Amino acid sequence: MTPPTRPLRLDGSGRTDRVMASLTGVVAVYRRLSGVSGRRRPPVLAVDRDLPLIVDDLRVEAEGVVSLRLVQERGEILPRWRPGAHVDLSPRPGLVRQYSLCGDPDDRSAYRVGVRLLGEGSTAVHALKKGARITARGPRNAFPFVASPAYLFIAGGIGITPILPMVRQAAASGADWQLVYTGRDRASMPFLEELSRFGERVWVRPDTEYGIPASGAELLEGAPENAPIYCCGPIPMIVGVRTDAALRPSGPVFFERFSTPPIVGGKPFQVRLARSGVTLDVPADRTTLDVLRETVPGIAYSCRQGFCGTCELPAVTGDRVRICVEREPVTFDL
């Protein structure tokens, strides 16, 4: 016998129990959102696909920030992606970094990324010229965008890149949404002109005009009740938003950080390199990746957060170790 699609009253009348029907709807929405909530990331599936691309255009978007338009040499259609996705870019052999796609998911003729000049990887990207060749892998998505009638977006600095496609999709869907965009000053904040068409839905909040946010609560003001929160930017901002969101009737917090998370409560340990017989000490406040890079030049890495897999190394046991986050004694097949 097929169960009823609506919960019935217990008095035998056969009529729908309106209270239980409402609760059933709430639970369904909760399950849909919590399945990809910021409390537990969905697995990031490996994408065994290298894309040889060409730099079709470069633009200066702000102080220290450029955007690249990347296309296939013969104009082939690129793989599909959804807001929140990123690609691994290799501007030169042995160097891999991750960058969020910030263009239009419906435009499969090109990918667009925004890159702030900070560190070795971004320096190599900024040095590229129009017509340069670059290898991409992906796209992959560790920051999934869920359907909802309302949203609050919070971006800090270059953290605007994964948020941009989400804002466009939210606007196109007719959702109720707000964006809080923070940064050092307007000159350093990319894509301001692009965002200006959304009017009062976007609060541009540079520190030079408003001061550094005192708490996450300040950035959460005016958020639609129970709306999902999407946050990308510096770690202190993300921590503040997640902490204060837990104290109010907000929806799930989805977040992505571009910097390495701090090591909290770490303990020192040792790793051994089987082929050379070298034993290395890993201090409580450093990663295996940091220590190995000083001894084994050329080790590939990218996200430094444990989900991209670029830094995986083989152990003599046959296991593969993500040396940016895993902290235990191990002997590597090196």
Q: Which residues does each predicted region cover?
A:
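A short, compositionally biased
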Residues: 83-84, 263-270, 307-309
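Iron-sulfur (Fe-S) cluster-binding modules
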Residues: 1-47, 333
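Local cysteine-cluster metal-coordination motifs and their immediate loop/turn environment
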Residues: 162, 293-330
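Short amphipathic, charge-patterned alpha-helical segments
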Residues: 87, 286-295
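FNR/FR-type flavoprotein reductase catalytic core
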Residues: 3-14, 120-277, 281-284
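Ferredoxin-reductase
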Residues: 39-133, 137-140, 146, 150-151, ...
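Short polybasic amphipathic segments
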Residues: 87, 269-274, 311-315
